[in-house]
């Protein structure tokens, strides 16, 4: 029997454990610029269920997190309209790191450095289970999607565009 690969705890998994949230671990070989498509492929998962955590900011530089399907992009115009902002754009990697405390490619919505509003593509909440970043490059965790609403107060939005 293959030995289960152990991954050391991250702030994200510590938060999940502290809140009694059951999760599965999915370590994989990280590929620079591989994104959610790569991790889905390597782990044999549907990219629609692999959720990426995107650090964005509004026109005033206020940070926010967007949870999006791995095979979709964010319509920043639709997102801005739904959250009452003039505009929204992705943060530069160093700014995203400053806000979240995580490296790009390893950003989890859990236990971020700064508390930020979290928005989740509405269709994600209808899935039975999702896989998202566990706080380290090459490390995903599987959870019930309702956890993002319960723990983070994530608000549903409709801003997905097919890639």
Where are these regions (language model features)?
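Extended, low-hydrophobicity, polar/charged segments
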Residues: 1-163
């Amino acid at each position: 029997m293959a030995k289960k690969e152990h991954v050391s705890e991250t702030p994200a998994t510590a938060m999940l454990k502290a809140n009694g949230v059951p999760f599965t671990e999915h370590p994989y070989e990280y590929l620079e610029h591989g994104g959610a498509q790569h991790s889905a492929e390597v782990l044999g998962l549907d990219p629609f269920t692999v959720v990426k955590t995107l650090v964005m900011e509004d026109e005033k530089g206020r940070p926010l997190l967007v949870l999006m399907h791995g095979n979709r992009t964010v319509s920043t115009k639709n997102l801005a309209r739904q959250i009452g902002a003039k505009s929204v754009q992705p943060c530069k990697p160093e700014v995203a790191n400053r806000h979240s405390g995580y490296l790009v490619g390893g950003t989890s919505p859990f236990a971020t450095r700064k508390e930020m509003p979290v928005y989740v593509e509405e269709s994600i909440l209808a899935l039975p289970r999702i896989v998202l970043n566990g706080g380290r490059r090459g490390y995903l965790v599987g959870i019930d999607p309702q956890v993002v609403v319960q723990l983070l107060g994530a608000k549903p939005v409709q801003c997905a565009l097919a890639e």
